[in-house]
Amino acid sequence: MAFNTETFMLKNQAAIQLYEEVKRQPIFDYHCHLDPKDIFEDHIFDNIVDLWLGGDHYKWRLMRANGISEAEITGPASNLEKFKAFARTLERAYGNPVYHWSAMELKNVFGVNEILTESNAEEIYHRLNHFLKEHKISPRRLIADSKVMFIGTTDHPLDTLEWHKKLAADESFKTVVAPTFRPDEAFIEHRHFVDFITKLGDITQKEITDFSTFIAAMEERIAYFAQNGCRASDISFTEIVFEQTDELELNDLFNKVCEGYIPNQSEISKWQTAVFMELCRLYKKYGFVTQVHFGALRNNHSTIFEKLGADVGVDSLGDQVALTVNMNRLLDSLVKKDSLPKMIWYNLNPAYNIAVANTLANFQANELGVRSYLQFGAGWWFADTKLGMISQMNALAEQGMLANFIGMLTDSRSFLSYQRHDYFRRILCTYLGEWIEEGEVPEDYQALGSMAKDIAYQNAVNYFKN
């Protein structure tokens, strides 16, 4: 069977027919890590390595596994040397999603149909660089060519949102670029917590002396984000915890940490529970969809982390005790306080998929008519694979409503990653097509095609309406 053809990843005739319904759908990319400044300034890319390999820890991780020196990954090697090193890696990467994504990016963006190998790497490298210049490939060009209607960036609570404002005022650019409120530093275990409190007080002109004044300052920033088009928040937790305490202990803990105290795990859990519940109350008040990424064990190779920083390819999926106990207690407490916002839960460890989907199904009741008020998010990071996507959809279909799923997001730092939406759509169509082929659902292409289109695009549009 030929590789990377029009029927790539479409395993049956039903899938091919369903794909015709979704392949031209626009993209609603509600969570990514693109820099809005890059989108606004719209510089033309002049080297494929900067565009394709720069900042891509998926590729870096794979290259290290293939014995590539750090000099050729993140170090001082020339761009051509880095490109050749990646090609040398890619030709051995069968079975890894990076192999598929790379082939799709080369073909669909640059018109390169050959399989990239070490032997043709130099010729393709020069051809790609020529293509970038000849076609004036820039961030906005890639966004427009991919039919991206909405981009949700990931933004620090103290960000001025200068570049979002400029993009919103630019009538020549039709894609909506909305900020996302990401308050990682609001949690006491974060190494920048104390500095964050100081800067938060400065920007809000508030004296932050305890838990309540801290939350009041956070609300001011949330309101500022809301005024500038924000539709969502995001947070990443290593574990989902639920450990309640009173405000007296929170105030004491706040002051001790600000004076240099290192909190223990129970104190970290109490602060996480209290702060997240207050944030959820505010997110509901301001109409933010609340995204929760959980289960990542980060920066495990301490030497690489100390040299290169975070998000460089040395992270793992984690595990935890009492996940569903804590999730149920947390969500139930939010319901009791009328503080449950629309939420998307992204689970990193597929072993918990059924448990997470099952737990979310307990709390779907709402009087707003929102379908799947709590969303089980798409396979994330290490689960952003064929098997990871299928595992997530299996769990959601069996424990909830797959038809209401808001579908794919890039969660990426690369302007080439929109091919992942097409990758997901192909896998989705094969998944639904197998139901038809095996007689598990009626052979109703209108109904299944409509379902596929909803998952590919329309469900997300509807879900993120304020």
From Swiss-Prot:
EC numbers for this chain: 5.3.1.12
Lineage: superkingdom: Bacteria
Molecular function as annotated in GO: glucuronate isomerase activity
Keywords of the record: Isomerase
Biological process, per Gene Ontology: D-galacturonate catabolic process; D-glucuronate catabolic process
Pathway: Carbohydrate metabolism; pentose and glucuronate interconversion
UniProt keyword Iron, yes or no: no
Catalytic activity, reaction form: D-glucuronate = D-fructuronate; aldehydo-D-galacturonate = keto-D-tagaturonate
One Pfam family linked to the record: UxaC
Disulfide bonds: none
Family per similarity comment: Belongs to the metallo-dependent hydrolases superfamily. Uronate isomerase family.
Protein name: Uronate isomerase
Organism whose genome encodes this protein: Streptococcus agalactiae serotype V (strain ATCC BAA-611 / 2603 V/R)
